[in-house]
């Protein structure tokens, strides 16, 4: 999937505020997720009609750590309104896929999402296979507590044959957000509009994605390097490499681990990700 895969994740107060933020961000993003469940009020039809970029509309229930606390039929009605309005995508939890299976008459595509807030399943590629025929896009998000936890996400992105969103929450997972655009089937990678507006742990800002990492310019011509680091100095060296790289020609990303674990982790990453040059710093 070509084009700018950087997506803003927004949780504004109301529709007009959201549209102003989208106008401000439009030149730096390819899509935007709008968290309807975190808004005080919203007009779905106006959002879809006036947005300068394609929208992913989400209404996450409280049981999935979202902000919607009303009855399930009411939440599904919000998603149906977004679907009928012609939003580019709606994000539907995997447990609710049966509820939307019969919807038609709209170009809106369905993202089936599943989150693990405390762990990282080792079998993300297998979970993807079980879901891919039930939706247009599979979104699988786990939590990384250690550097090795990001491997299932990167394997998922590498092996996917249909549109996919995959990332690891938590500080070790930041590298998955930066590497995601490298993989052909990746639909998007989320960024925050500012460091004070993070919507998930491990997020980085759109400005950093755009100006430091040039993710909007990443493509087949980009040489990609994953540096397994063991110190602050190693991390700084990787940032220096990225800052010196010409836009879109090289992507340098660090993954921090312990000195004892670094050689084995780098070997595992290199074996699993042949398209990426893995180095142990």
Per-region residue spans from a language model:
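Structural motif
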Residues: 16-17, 124, 148-149, 259-266
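Short, surface-exposed connector motifs at secondary-structure boundaries
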Residues: 26-31, 82-89, 132-139, 157-164, ...
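Active-site beta->alpha loop and helix N-cap motifs at the rims of alpha/beta catalytic domains
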Residues: 2-122, 130, 134, 142
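Catalytic alpha/beta core domains of metabolic enzymes, predominantly
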Residues: 95-227, 231-234, 244
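Conserved strand-to-helix beginnings and helix N-cap segments that scaffold or border functional pockets
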Residues: 19, 44-45, 124-125, 150-154, ...
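General beta-strand structural signal in soluble alpha/beta enzymes
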Residues: 57, 91-92, 112, 166, ...
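Short coil/turn connectors at secondary-structure junctions
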Residues: 2-5, 52-53, 106-107, 161-162, ...
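N-terminal ligand-binding/catalytic initiation module
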Residues: 219, 223-281
